[in-house]
Regions:
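Hydrophobic alpha-helical connector segments
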Residues: 68-96
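Secondary-structure edge/capping motif, primarily at the C-terminal ends of alpha-helices
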Residues: 67-70, 98-105, 133, 160-168
Length: 204
């Protein structure tokens, strides 16, 4: 279990990375943000790579909890886009990982491994959900179309932030709702939901 100081270091690093980008923040910047000495920070983390590893672990734990079978079993077709909104909320907490993922993966091997692992986990979880919805006749999509829907969802989840950054849209909530709107526009017509449910989703 990480010490309170280590957790404070990770929380401060996460804030700075999200605000300024990982590349613009040094270990000294993180120490100054916390008003501790660089030596104190070094005692807990021997450089930025270990800090990044700690943040990857935090994010992995959050996503594993969200994507575990017991959680997925509770997600019904009418809940799907709310579920995606929660995934986006988790993602926005660690949005620096999606700003320049290729650069991060090149610098930090664990990030590259984590991105691949996350995509596989999302593919598996989303595939199971859509397959169940189709079996319940709550989704009109063939197996091939379901695979493409999974690809589309993951592409938006992993790439939309970069697109928004290029358009100077850096507000986390705006980025979240843009990604969610893209998915709803493309996928909602495939779902067989009650009109009241669809109306609520469009207003959310």
């Amino acid at each position: 279990m990480a010490s309170k100081t280590a957790e404070r270091i990770l929380a401060a690093a996460l804030t700075l990375f999200n605000e300024q980008g990982e590349n613009a923040v040094t270990s000294v910047d993180i120490a100054m943000e916390l008003d501790i000495s660089p030596g104190n920070l070094y005692y807990h983390f021997k450089g930025k790579e270990q800090i990044i590893d700690g943040l990857v672990h935090w994010y992995s734990e959050a996503m594993q909890t969200l994507l575990r079978p017991a959680t997925l079993e509770k997600v019904q077709a009418e809940d799907f886009f709310y579920f995606i909104a929660i995934v986006l909320d988790k993602q926005q907490l660690f949005r620096f990982m999606y700003r320049s993922p290729a650069d991060l993966a090149e610098k930090y091997p664990k990030v590259k491994h984590w991105h691949k692992q996350q995509i596989r986990q999302l593919e598996s979880s989303l595939t199971k959900l859509l397959l169940r919805f189709a079996a319940q006749e709550a989704l009109l999509a063939s197996s091939a179309e379901q695979r493409l829907m999974v690809d589309l969802i993951i592409m938006i989840l992993t790439q939309a932030n970069q697109y928004d950054d290029l358009r100077n849209i850096d507000d986390p909530q705006a980025q979240k709702f843009h990604a969610l709107s893209l998915m709803m526009t493309a996928l909602l017509p495939r779902f067989r939901l009650q009109e009241t449910t669809v109306a609520q989703l469009r207003k959310a």
